[in-house]
């Protein structure tokens, strides 16, 4: 009697399909999105990972608000939240926000209350249901009280096999790079910087294997290996 039943995907199951691997992290994000009450998630790890890709996927959600931590200000975010009441607040590189700018999130995330005093006048909103998703390159620069309000996920380094697969699929599928050039780029950059961003830069320019070798030999001689993280 069950042979004709089709398994229906939940609304959030389609998110993160473009991110290779990290299935456990994808599942955690989907569980947070499906939660009846706000659950906040912070992805922490070195640069050159796909942390930002998770936030970019969430930007397609209705009522989402994306913030670059390096340019964010407390006053600007408070003003936006008062005016628009976004359901999802997405903060990339939250560790680059000053402590005074991070602090306003404490009450919002803990109690759903947002208040502000200006020119001796106070305004406040209560029962704000805002999910906060953030990334951090250096979690030590995120206030400890703020860390405690997040479900913190520390990302693990990629193996060579994971780096190779991710780079080749990223270059061939998203950037339309020929497979042989993508493979050569992955192999070469692993020994130089192990940085996916470097692979993308080369993939966008190289039209042949000779181009890959030329770029790497002449312009990446002083690159230092980076720790690339899963996620």
Predicted regions and their residues:
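Pre-Walker A (pre-P-loop) alpha-helix and adjacent loop at the N terminus of AAA/AAA+ ATPase modules
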Residues: 3-40
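Short glycine-rich substrate-engagement loop in P-loop NTPases that contacts/grips substrate
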Residues: 62-88
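Conserved AAA+ ATPase small/helical "lid" subdomain
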Residues: 176-224
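C-terminal engagement/docking regions of AAA+ P-loop ATPases
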Residues: 47, 87, 107, 219-231
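Walker A/P-loop
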Residues: 33-67, 82
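AAA+/SF3 P-loop NTPase mechanochemical coupling elements
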Residues: 47, 117-135
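Conserved AAA+/SF3 P-loop NTPase catalytic/coupling segment centered on the Walker-B
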Residues: 54-57, 86-112, 139-148
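Conserved AAA+ ATPase core "coupling" helix
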Residues: 142-176
């Amino acid at each position: 009697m069950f042979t004709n039943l089709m398994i229906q995907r939940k609304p959030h199951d389609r998110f993160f399909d473009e991110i290779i691997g990290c299935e456990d992290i994808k599942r955690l994000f989907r569980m947070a999105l499906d939660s009846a009450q706000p659950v906040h998630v912070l992805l922490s790890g070195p640069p050159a990972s796909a942390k930002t890709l998770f936030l970019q996927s969430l930007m397609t959600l209705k009522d989402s608000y994306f913030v670059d931590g390096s340019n964010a200000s407390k006053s600007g975010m408070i003003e936006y939240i008062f005016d628009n009441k976004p359901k999802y607040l997405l903060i990339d590189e939250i560790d680059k926000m000053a402590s005074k700018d991070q602090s306003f999130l404490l009450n919002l995330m803990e109690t759903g209350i947002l208040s502000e005093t200006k020119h001796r006048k106070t305004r406040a909103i209560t029962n704000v249901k805002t999910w906060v998703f953030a990334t951090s390159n250096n979690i030590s620069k995120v206030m400890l009280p703020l860390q405690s309000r997040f479900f913190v996920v520390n990302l693990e380094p990629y193996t060579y096999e994971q780096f190779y697969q991710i780079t080749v699929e990223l270059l061939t599928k998203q950037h339309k790079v020929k497979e042989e050039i993508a493979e050569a780029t992955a192999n070469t950059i692993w020994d130089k910087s192990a940085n996916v961003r470097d692979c993308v830069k080369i993939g966008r320019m190289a039209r042949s294997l000779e181009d890959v070798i030329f770029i790497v030999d002449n312009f990446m001689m002083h690159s230092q290996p980076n720790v690339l993280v899963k996620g």
